[in-house]
Amino acid sequence: MSERKTPRLLLGLIAIAVIGSAAFYLMPGVKTDASEALDNAKSSQKLQSLAELDGKAPASRKLDVQSWNTAEGAKVLFVEAHELPMFDMRLIFAAGSSQDGNAPGLAILTNAMLNEGVAGKDVGAIAQGFESLGADFGNGAYKDMALASLRSLSAADKREPALKLFSEVVGKPTFPADSFARIKNQMLAGFEYQKQNPGKLASLELMKRLYGDHPYAHSSDGNAQSVPKITLAQLREFHAKAYAAGNVVIALVGDLSRTEAEAIANQVSSALPKGPALAKIAQPQEPKASINHIEFPSKQTNLLLAQLGIDRDDPDYAALSMGNQILGGGGFGTRLMSEVREKRGLTYGVYSGFSPMQARGPFMINLQTRAEMSEGTLKLVQDVLADYLKTGPTQKELDDAKRELAGSFPLSTASNADIVGQLGAMGFYNLPLSYLDDFMRQSQSLTVEQVKDAMNKHLSTDKLVIVSAGPTVPQKPLPAPSDKPAEQPLGVPEH
């Protein structure tokens, strides 16, 4: 499923996608390997009734977030928004690939199978059922979490049957064998495609090197060896425990009263399997710094530099978000983009980002560059990082980043879809209901020294795990920095 792009500064809550978890606010971004193909295959079509409303998003406003727990143990966050006659609901389960155990790919397969069948309805009938009501269903699974979402008109004659079907899909899927085989084949085709994608190969290798035996090490999609071995019995067992009412956060936004919202939450949570929240995963061990190369025939080399970052509870979150925005999270004008692309023309783009998760997510820098200049470019990136850690941001850089945040921040609550993503993140990571205001206040009060101290506390050039993927070729010296670099970046990245 796809989501709107939102300001990079809220990384983690509104995150980037570098490692495989991301189309959801917060996870940074980590769009999983074969999951894009699955998402495309399973994306639902919008009826005109909702499509027309999508262009009429209400303006940003202060949120009055209400929260409670259902009798079954589901945590609910709700915001009334009566500007449009519709509502958005998102269920966030602690049912991502970090819960796969010895069956990598189990979480994403379970999630992908939710809307493939319920009693009396196959995948086509389910899709038609939502369409006939003007409703949208969406799903996805990532490192920490699995999602199921519903967008519906709020009128009772549309809302109630849409909720009934949604509750069946999420709570009582039948997991038909023919769909299971088809989705497995789609995933296996995705694994074959990965072999021709040096960027993906580098990403997979990086996560293994960075996380070792930790659950974050394996791709959310599993692999060509693990997926064929997964059985329907494993899906049913995983669904029974990971999709339990005690393991879900329900985010609701829209044209509903508190009474209606409570009834919806009760209906959905009572349809789920009974059970408690799953235990949180352990923190990863610090890996050894290393440099690793994957030989791949191409004109460019993919470079990934990473180390363990922070979890979502870290008190330095705001300072690191601001610091990364200046380093490489904000596109043109950042330290990395200025030195690597704008002055030397060595890359199409270079980006950095933290991906805070339940356990420590990665900090990562990624780029593609000309193969014959890959070694020099790698050293340049390391030098830029080292210099930034040594000097910190300038006052002007910090002031500019604060202004950018102040200007873009209202977009984070501009529509119901934006708000439901924020609520889901707040509930899943146990953030205070005042989180958005707190984050903005903390960010705007930061000093240069606070940003510098936070970046140095959590980052070190001596801890980098580096993976490159490309050909081994004779190296050329880098061009001197210039306002008009002689070496222009290739127009389009290879992968």
Annotated model-derived regions:
Residues 79, 84-111, 123-170, 184, ...:
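M16 family metallopeptidases and their MPP-like homologs
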Residues 458-462:
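Short segments within alpha-helical structural elements
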Residues 117-120, 170-178:
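Short, polar/flexible loop-turn hinges at active-site or ligand-entry regions and domain interfaces
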Residues 5-136, 149-154, 160, 164, ...:
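His/Glu-rich zincin catalytic helix
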Residues 191:
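N-terminal glycine-/lysine-enriched basic segments
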Residues 1-3:
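Juxtamembrane low-complexity tails/linkers enriched in Ser/Thr-Pro and polybasic
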Residues 127, 181, 228, 236, ...:
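Generic structural signal for individual residues within well-ordered alpha-helical segments
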Residues 43-66, 208-248, 278-284, 409, ...:
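Histidine-acidic residue clusters that define the catalytic metal-binding segment
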